[in-house]
Amino acid sequence: MRRLLYTINVTLDGCVDHRAVDATEELHAHAASVLAGADALLFGRVTYQMMEGAWRAPHSDAMPAETQQFARAIDAADKFVASSTLASVDWNAQLMTGDLADAVRRIKDGPGDYVYVGGVQLPTALADLGLIDEYEFVVHPTVAGHGPRPFDGLSHPLDLTLTGAEEWRSGAVARRYVPRATA
C-alpha cells in the first residue's frame, strides 16, 4: 500500500503562500527529488491549475538547472485531481470521481512507495479523514504577516511524531512527521 506524503513550504508565522518563500536552488533540488520519487501527485483543483500554469512543458532554457529538474519532474508525473467543478483534466492527470475518501483509498491501494499531496484545502480534508501517512513542513526563516495557513478548519488536532529533519544554507528546515498512532 502506498503512503500519502503531504509536503508544504511554510513561513515561521504559518503562511503557505508560495510567493512568501524564497525558492532557492537547493530547495528546488529537494522538491524535485521528492516529486521524482513519488508514484503520482495528488492535487485539488486550485493547486492543479496553478502547477499546470507554472510547470507544464515547454520550459524556459533560462531556468537554473535545479529549477529545470523540478519542472521536468512535475511535468512528467502522473497526477490525480480532486475537483467537483472540473469536467476534465489532461497533463498526465486523472479526475477523481465519487467519494473523496474512497477515491484516495483506491489510489493508496496501488503499487509503489508514495503519492505526493500538495495544496492547502485538499490536505486539510485528507488529514480530517486520517488518510495522510507522512507530513513534511519546509519551514522558511521568513515572517509573511499574511496569507493562507494549513489546516484551517481541521476538525481535530493532529498528534505527530518527528521522524527526520534536514537544514539548508538558506536557513530553511524540512521536518518530517508521521501521525503518532502509526509512529
Report each predicted region and the residues it spans.
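Enzymes that bind and transform nitrogen-containing heteroaromatic metabolites
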Residues: 1-183
